[in-house]
Swiss-Prot record:
<feature type="region of interest" description="Catalytic">
    <location>
        <begin position="185"/>
        <end position="478"/>
    </location>
</feature>
<dbReference type="GO" id="GO:0005737">
    <property type="term" value="C:cytoplasm"/>
</dbReference>
<dbReference type="GO" id="GO:0000049">
    <property type="term" value="F:tRNA binding"/>
</dbReference>
<dbReference type="Pfam" id="PF03129">
    <property type="entry name" value="HGTP_anticodon"/>
</dbReference>
<keyword id="KW-0479">Metal-binding</keyword>
<keyword id="KW-0436">Ligase</keyword>
<dbReference type="GO" id="GO:0046872">
    <property type="term" value="F:metal ion binding"/>
</dbReference>
<dbReference type="InterPro" id="IPR036621">
    <property type="entry name" value="Anticodon-bd_dom_sf"/>
</dbReference>
<protein>
    <recommendedName>
        <fullName>Threonine--tRNA ligase</fullName>
        <ecNumber>6.1.1.3</ecNumber>
    </recommendedName>
</protein>
<keyword id="KW-0547">Nucleotide-binding</keyword>
<feature type="binding site">
    <location>
        <position position="278"/>
    </location>
    <ligand>
        <name>Zn(2+)</name>
    </ligand>
</feature>
<comment type="subunit">
    <text>Homodimer.</text>
</comment>
<comment type="similarity">
    <text>Belongs to the class-II aminoacyl-tRNA synthetase family.</text>
</comment>
<dbReference type="InterPro" id="IPR006195">
    <property type="entry name" value="aa-tRNA-synth_II"/>
</dbReference>
<dbReference type="GO" id="GO:0006435">
    <property type="term" value="P:threonyl-tRNA aminoacylation"/>
</dbReference>
<dbReference type="GO" id="GO:0004829">
    <property type="term" value="F:threonine-tRNA ligase activity"/>
</dbReference>
<dbReference type="InterPro" id="IPR012947">
    <property type="entry name" value="tRNA_SAD"/>
</dbReference>
Amino acid sequence: MSEKLDKEDVLYKKRHSIAHVMAEAVIELFPNTKIAIGPPIKDGFYYDFDFEKHIIEDDLLLIEQKMREILKTGSSFVKEVITKEQALMLFKDEPYKIDLIHELDIADEISIYKSHNFTDLCKGPHIDNMGKIDPKAFKLISIAGAYWRGDEKNKMLTRIYGTLWNNEKDLKAYLKLREEIKRRDHRKLGRELDLFSVHEEIGPGLIFFHPSGARIRALIEDFWREEHFKNGYDILFTPHVGKSWLWETSGHLDFYKESMFEKMEMDKSNYYVKPMNCPFHIAIYNTGRHSYRDLPFRWAELGTVYRYEKVGALHGTMRVRGFTQDDAHIICTYDQVKFEVQEVLRFALYMWNKFGFTALKAYLSTKPEKSVGDEDDWIMSVKVLKEALINLGIDYDIDEGGGAFYGPKIDLKIIDSLGREWQMSTIQFDFNLPARFKMTYTAEDGKERQPFMIHRALLGSIERFFGILVEHYGGAFPVWLAPLQVVIIPVNNIVEEYALEVLSRFKKEGIRIKLDNDCNMRMNAKIRQYQSQKVPYMFIVGEKEVVEGKISIRTRTNEQINGLELKEALEFVKLKVSNKEIL
């Protein structure tokens, strides 16, 4: 569920208004520029321009200066309603505005906003006048390319992003947070820590996990599987492709085709790589007959799916074209629904906690205007979702009418160490696919009934969750997730025999450890190197440690733990791993 912006919020109006101020400043500085659209967004605003000349980051300072000059006038924002004919005449030299106007119906209200020397096609809302904007509380922050209307077939425009806050203090706090976000960017850390790569020449949006990143991914997936078995799930494996009839039956080719890869023709049949796992799980269900005594089925899969995303929308491991969903489908009876939903919710909270996420937000989306399924089933399922949230003490917001046409859902968002929300788990009823695929079971009264089906993801996708973890921890993973947990650094060659003994002892206990006996680098340089690589522990081995049979530990945060017995050091690390300690 995307976050909705409150159009009546004063800050929203300010950001909308300053986008107009920026557009006016740009036109004054670059007179032949054509304007497109400029909305407020979370934390700021942007405007898309068609420049005659290429602009650079240095130009942003000139634009900011001109914006402050315009703000000093204190001009009002005045709304006027005009006809479509008047709008076409007013914006006759603005091709992007004309494009928008042509889409409007003759009966539609067309509004413009005038401010200082600028007029824009706009629905609003805006603040009354520019005097309400603190000229020290905004900053233009970046330039990017953006296709007109988001369509790669259209011209690439120049998008200028800015941020605006109520005062200078809030602006500085945001800019500081922004710098920390840049420092933790999973794409940057992915290169620095050698975790993953993307190869445009092979295919955009396709992730290559390197040994260290693959180790972390394997640890996530192993834990996922272990916990699913503990919670009564069976693990499935299904193909990556399926014939077109499957996607016709599921409705994907009717409603989801734009997000699917093109068909492949083989053996006189059309195949598609799967955008979702659900139809495959249903195919397994439909291979046999089922009684109410067999239910519930809890079927989970780390299933790789493929979805066509526009190149401009791709973002590291967060937005990709091929990704692995931690997918599950619960197939159950009416009487089992309440328990199953509550258990899924409890399971989600448990999993997040183990990865270090304790803060969350929940959203319950209810029946939309157009829907499928029995009215009583909708009422019951919404009630069950509400009760599950209440029983587990989870505060939630209701998105009335925001559910999918095939069923209500709970969306759960985690809040990371930088205060950002990330969509993670979804618990979604489906009244559509069971009917489309004619799923049935024999009820207690001997009649054939349609089972309830609940779609469920806990981590969302492994690739995206991986990127979130990288940024949440800034690459300094908890010991249990660290690809390399310990490095032994001997102070000289004399102690190497003892260092090898430590290495062997820890390896036998499953600790991910290595010995750095490179004589060409000083010890302090090695410590700095491994701290920059976010290795949790460095074991410093000198002659004193050899004589006493002990270990001195330096942590990646530069803490020192001296004089631990070898057995104590081993237990110290093992405890951090077995308890999945976060700090």
